[in-house]
């Protein structure tokens, strides 16, 4: 959940300060780093309502990246996005995973699964099943 009364920079600053960061220059540098990583450079003074849905989602991902997590859990991260924004989020997750962070995503969007095949697990009648999506799709 984004803080609607704070701009992009302040949303990220809040998380860093809440997790123990104290040095203002280090905070500023870390914010610049994650904004660059998620493609929101020059948006630091925009309010959340001034961002598109895709940009808001990128800001949420930036918040998740601030403290260099080993795992990101994403629940329907492309659910309310147009196809172009959805594709951008999926490409961003692929880049994040390529940098060594595991991304676990819950989705009902079969198009994303088809376009970005990877290890896929589904819940079926209370059971967890791993699906070989690559062979199913013929890749």
What is each PLM-predicted segment?
Residues 6-14:
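Short coil-to-helix segment of the ABC ATPase nucleotide-binding domain corresponding to the Q-loop/switch region
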Residues 66-70:
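A short, proline-enriched helix->beta-strand linker immediately N-terminal to the Walker B motif
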Residues 61:
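Hydrophobic anchor residue at the start of the ABC signature
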Residues 47-51, 55:
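Conserved ABC ATPase signature
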């Amino acid at each position: 959940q984004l803080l609607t009364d704070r701009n992009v920079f302040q949303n990220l600053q809040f998380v860093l300060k809440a997790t123990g960061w104290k040095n203002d220059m280090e905070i500023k540098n870390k914010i610049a780093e994650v904004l660059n990583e998620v493609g929101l450079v020059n948006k630091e003074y925009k309010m959340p309502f001034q961002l598109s849905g895709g940009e808001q989602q990128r800001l949420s991902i930036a918040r998740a990246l601030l403290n260099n997590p080993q795992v990101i859990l994403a629940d329907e991260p492309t659910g309310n996005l147009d196809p172009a924004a959805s594709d951008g989020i999926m490409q961003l997750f692929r880049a994040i995973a390529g940098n060594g962070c595991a991304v676990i995503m819950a989705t009902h969007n079969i198009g994303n699964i088809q376009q970005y095949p990877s290890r896929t697990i589904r819940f079926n009648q209370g059971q967890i099943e791993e699906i070989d999506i690559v062979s199913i799709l013929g890749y």
